[in-house]
């Protein structure tokens, strides 16, 4: 008897739980037929003058039935003496707001793009995103490069939430962009403006889905309800790390709606993307002889291999209506363990997550905390003492968890984000949110 057959006949009572009354086979491929469709990317008309510090907008044209991905293109010129650059296309896109029928649906910020990338993109996706939005660090002054910034609104992330323009006959969909007045290494060198810096050019491309007649009619005539995600951000708080003591701070969380996670970072408001004392560097802290000019260079690879000891947060906890939601945990727990348990990625130092959901990156809801039903929510923070000479990285890494480099006192902007669920209702040619703040 063949050896495989001996395994096959070795069948007992326990096997019933695995193979009794089988529901699938691995040896017959099953597929499903899909509705006929086509996708085309079409450039939009920009209203306003594109330039540093300006605001522009675009009204999504009615070229197709649904819209999904949106990519913003910038052409930037490396300016003057160069200066340190770090994701300049992100930095330039200071914020972008989505509006339907005059109602704000969502708003994203350049720091949120950086935080989202740090938390949710993995390996090749993160590297490819960097290629789209950052210099590769060897361009000469005067070099031009075309950058691509994909938007991350709810309908940009899955075709199942594609926005049905065909059902919004009476409401327009608009995007409002605010462009930053200063971009490191483009028109600003870290301390002053770069003379003669070239203005950016900008274009907006939208992916349209064209449906076949029967499905197009259904989308146009039937009402729709979409479970969407929104970003809540109430503005930067002022962080208060100290060079002489372990300072503490309580931050009121003014959020609403069922929320699946909180994400926060401490950043240097004059150096985009710097979330640690030494500006997020991967291998520059390997020895005591590293020059200061090297250790303050941002991590272009964004590999997340740098040490949490360079971050300013010592510990944190959340309180709901005066009750501890959980015991005080170290900052490294929110940077390492929480992302590991809920997302599975490697998060750069200085970016923190607390998830109420089992799988916060998934479209399927898997847990929330309803902040609309909480009167008083507080994020309690304790900072490290920022007292060690930043020019000696080995001294920083060789010390205790409660101290860090003196340059961590520059991390004075605290950005806290909440990602919540809401319902977008579309009927009678109009769309709007089911629940307001």
From Swiss-Prot:
Single GO term (MF): structural molecule activity
Mod. after translation: Myristoylated at the C-terminus. Glycosylated; highly branched oligosaccharides. The pattern of glycosylation sites are unusual.
Cellular component terms per the entry's GO annotation: viral capsid
InterPro entries, per database record: Capsid_N, MCP_C, MCP_C_sf, VP_dsDNA_II
SUPFAM superfamilies named among the record's database cross-references: Group II dsDNA viruses VP (SSF49749)
Subcellular compartments: Virion
Pfam families with a match to the protein in the record: Capsid_N, Capsid_NCLDV
Induction description: Expressed in the late phase of the viral replicative cycle.
Keywords of the record: Capsid protein, Glycoprotein, Late protein, Lipid-binding, Virion
Residues the record marks as carrying a glycan: 280, 302, 399, 406
Presence of the UniProt keyword Glycoprotein in the record: yes
Keyword Protein biosynthesis part of the UniProt annotation: no
Gene3D superfamilies in alphabetical order: Adenovirus Type 2 Hexon, domain 4, Major capsid protein Vp54
Family to which this protein belongs: Belongs to the NCLDV major capsid protein family.
Note: The viral capsid possesses up to five major capsid protein variants. They behave as asymmetric capsid components.
Function, in words: Major capsid protein self-assembles to form an icosahedral capsid with a pseudo T=169 symmetry, about 190 nm in diameter, and consisting of 1680 major capsid proteins trimers. The capsid consists in 5040 copies of the major capsid protein (hexamers), 60 copies of the penton protein (pentamers) and 1800 minor capsid proteins of different types. The minor capsid proteins form a hexagonal network below the outer capsid shell, stabilizing the capsid by binding neighboring capsomers together.
Record-given protein name: Major capsid protein
Source organism: Paramecium bursaria Chlorella virus 1 (PBCV-1)
